[in-house]
Structure formats: C-alpha cells, structure tokens
C-alpha cells in the first residue's frame, strides 16, 4: 500500500511528515498513522476545511484563496508549505478538493482534488546552512 511505502521511505531517510487536509478530513493522516512505525515520522496534522482555518493555521494567503480558490494547485502548495513549517517537518502533504455531492462547477467538478507536497530540507556546507524548499507533486517521487 502507498502509505506503507511512504512510512518506509520516511524511516529510511529519517524525515518527518505532517498533513494539512480539507476535503479528506483526516483520512490521509489516518492512513499514514495506521502503519506500524508511523509515530516515529508523523509530527502533527491539520484539518482546515474553512478558508479562515487555512489562513490562520497554515498561512495560506488571502490573495491566493480569492484569486485561485480553495480548490487549486496554488492553495494545495501553500497548505503543504504551511503545514511543514508549522510542524517543523521535512515534508508537508496536503489535500484540497470538492468532495460533493454538491459544490462542483464545470471548471471544478465534484471529485476534483489537488494534492500538495512540500519538501523542506536544511543542508550544511562549508559556506554555512541553507534551506531548499520545493513544492510540487513531482518532488514526492524523489523522496
């Protein structure tokens, strides 16, 4: 199962993960936490169904929510980034979408979901410490 592979990789790399969920309402966190060993890698989770909660708890910008909407790639990225920073985790995962049965539109139909992944790692070199942050669904494949 995917969640078992996620926990396995996190344990191998000694990374921590946190989640920020909207339409999944904690399902993602629950799936991860059902895997033995998850308590070593899972920091905390946020269920931020309202826009106000996304702004207050995760730092999603009001402008992003107005311009792109709560269900958007941009919001998913900001949710993942905010969750990782709040929890001081290396990885933030987020979900936002339209669960239904109502609320869908032609542009954003019921069932549309965006998954955000933000990887925040701190590297040390002879020049000092610096951070590298990537927010993109594709970065998860490299972990």
Model-flagged regions — what are they?
Residues 1-143:
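Short alpha-helical segments enriched in small residues
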């Amino acid at each position: 199962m995917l969640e078992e592979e996620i926990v396995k990789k996190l344990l191998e790399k000694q990374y921590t993960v946190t989640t920020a969920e909207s339409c999944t309402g904690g399902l993602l966190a629950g799936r991860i936490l059902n895997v033995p060993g998850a308590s070593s890698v899972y920091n905390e989770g946020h269920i931020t169904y309202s826009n106000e909660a996304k702004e207050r708890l995760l730092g999603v910008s009001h402008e992003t929510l107005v311009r792109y909407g709560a269900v958007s790639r941009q919001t998913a990225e900001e949710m993942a980034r905010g969750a990782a920073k709040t929890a001081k985790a290396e990885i933030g995962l987020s979900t936002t979408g339209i669960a239904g049965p109502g609320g869908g539109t032609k542009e954003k139909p019921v069932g549309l979901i965006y998954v955000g992944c933000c990887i925040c790692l701190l590297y040390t070199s002879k020049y000092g410490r610096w951070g590298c942050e990537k927010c993109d669904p594709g970065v998860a494949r490299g972990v």
